[in-house]
Amino acid sequence: MLFAILGHIMAQKATIYKVELSVSDMDRHYYETHKLTVAKHPSETDERLMVRLLAFAMNAQERLEMTKGLSTDDEPDIWLKSLSDELELWVALGLPSEKIVRQSCGKSDAVIVYSYGGHTAQMWWEKIKNSTTRFNNLQVVNLLEAETSALGQLASRAMKLQVNIQDGEVMVSVGESIVYLTPEIWKGV
């Protein structure tokens, strides 16, 4: 009987996604394919997972890595570390608190926050934007709610994802499905 009770309180496990991510970034002249194994936290939505993959594509380079993400408080969703293990890029998703933004700006050479969530994201930005002006290494990019919602519909456990970036606009395709995104720069560096 005790085993049956314990079985119900065991933590849910992450779902594994296999992703072949082809990035064609005409703005940065970056053209590579990344084979990623991505763990989706039980509390993570398909929309957030796809925003994470989009953020990876928009910053793709050789040493860029996905971290433990939602399962740890002191790591970003994505980071780039130097060969000497110093943080060069900290990529956060969603609506981090001003405290987390401040701490991440102190830990990394560059910080990018990809906010999403429509009106909630706008309220978050209005609340913290005045306290972020002193951070010269912070960039805030907002993704429109309708676009990220459509992106979430593309999620599947095995994906071949093509991301094309040109003139700040993004096209994401999985099979025959295509989503166009126009990220808004709320704070540039």
Regions found by a protein language model. Give the residues of each.
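Short polybasic amphipathic segments
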Residues: V19-L21, I78, E169-S173
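Long amphipathic N-terminal alpha/beta scaffold segment
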Residues: E65-L83
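Feature captures the catalytic cores and cofactor-binding loops of soluble hydro-lyases/lyases
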Residues: P96-Q153
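Non-catalytic C-terminal interaction segments of nucleic acid-processing enzymes
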Residues: N137, L143-V189
